[in-house]
């Protein structure tokens, strides 16, 4: 029997299967192989004498550390438009981490009622130009909720963003609506409002939402200096057009990315953020 781990606590794992949620323990072989089951893992289980056992952990497509979740495919990067104002460097940092982890990012701009249509259009154009979809939402009023739900299907989605952006409000709105639609809360896993410290997957419209914020640490200096450029999708059309193989678009001559910046084809502020991050990596790692 196959399923997905939606919660793990105290050595027990709760597996969502076609036959319902089954409480399992892991085989001892995983400890010997230093492989610990994670929320989000797709697994093969066996029920013996009424007790479930995890027999196999399927290959992971991704693995986050904070929160500890496997196979995340999508991130809702939640920022407030106002109160506080958008910090573009911080937004870029979240987007860089999403790209590094091969996670599709959707930028969700909350408190959309606090800005003009012109301001929204300018922000949308800015973010679209660097390769990301933008959704305008109002987490308290539920505006934009249906558009978010559409994007949850067939994904494991994590919410990330700075404090005060509305992540908890949005998350609790998803949890409350899911409870109303299903009519009950699973007593076995004890799901309630967003109070648990243990990561859990919320089943929403043929997809899953991680109930703890993603990327709670924003350090990017672990990224290899030669890999950073691949975290900027707007560089993709130019990476192979530079004179030198392996060009990092830094101090190298005849660089196609730098030329694209000068021609206005790549956003100058994004490129400056890239250089600042690259120098941070070089200075931190001494290479």
Swiss-Prot record:
Its main location: cytoplasm. It comes from the Bacteria. It is an enzyme of class 3 (hydrolase). The keyword Metal-binding applies. Residues 61-218 form the CP-type G domain. Zn(2+) binds at residues 242, 247, 249, 255. GO terms for molecular function: GTP binding; GTPase activity; metal ion binding; rRNA binding. Disulfide bonds: none annotated. Its EC number is 3.6.1.-. One of its GO terms (cellular component) is cytoplasm. One of several proteins that assist in the late maturation steps of the functional core of the 30S ribosomal subunit. Helps release RbfA from mature subunits. May play a role in the assembly of ribosomal proteins into the subunit. Circularly permuted GTPase that catalyzes slow GTP hydrolysis, GTPase activity is stimulated by the 30S ribosomal subunit. This is Small ribosomal subunit biogenesis GTPase RsgA. The gene is rsgA.
């Amino acid at each position: 029997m196959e399923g997905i781990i939606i919660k793990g606590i105290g050595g027990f794992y709760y597996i969502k299967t076609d036959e319902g949620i089954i409480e399992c323990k892991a085989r001892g072989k995983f400890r010997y192989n230093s492989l610990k089951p994670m929320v989000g893992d797709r697994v093969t289980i066996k029920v013996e004498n009424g007790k479930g056992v995890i027999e196999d952990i399927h290959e992971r497509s991704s693995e986050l550390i904070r929160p500890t979740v496997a196979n995340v495919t999508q991130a809702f990067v939640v920022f407030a438009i106002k109160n506080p104002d958008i910090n573009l460097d911080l937004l870029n940092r979240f987007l860089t981490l999403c790209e590094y982890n091969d996670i599709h990012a959707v930028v969700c701009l909350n408190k959309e009622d606090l800005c003009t249509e012109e301001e929204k259009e300018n922000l949308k154009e800015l973010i679209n130009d660097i390769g990301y979809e933008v959704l305008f939402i109002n987490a308290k009023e539920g505006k934009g909720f249906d558009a978010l739900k559409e994007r949850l299907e067939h994904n494991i989605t994590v919410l990330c963003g700075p404090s005060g952006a509305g992540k908890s409000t949005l998350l609790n709105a998803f949890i409350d609506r899911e409870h109303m639609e299903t009519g009950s809360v699973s007593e076995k896993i004890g799901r309630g409002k967003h109070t648990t410290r243990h990561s859990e997957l919320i089943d929403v419209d043929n997809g899953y939402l991680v109930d703890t914020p993603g990327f709670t640490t924003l350090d990017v200096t672990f990224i290899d200096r030669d890999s950073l450029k691949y975290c900027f999708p707007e560089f993709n059309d130019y990476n192979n057009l530079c004179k030198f193989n392996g060009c990092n678009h830094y101090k190298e001559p005849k660089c196609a990315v730098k030329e694209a910046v000068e021609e206005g084809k790549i956003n100058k502020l994004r490129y400056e953020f890239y250089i600042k991050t690259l120098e941070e990596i070089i200075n931190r790692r001494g290479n």
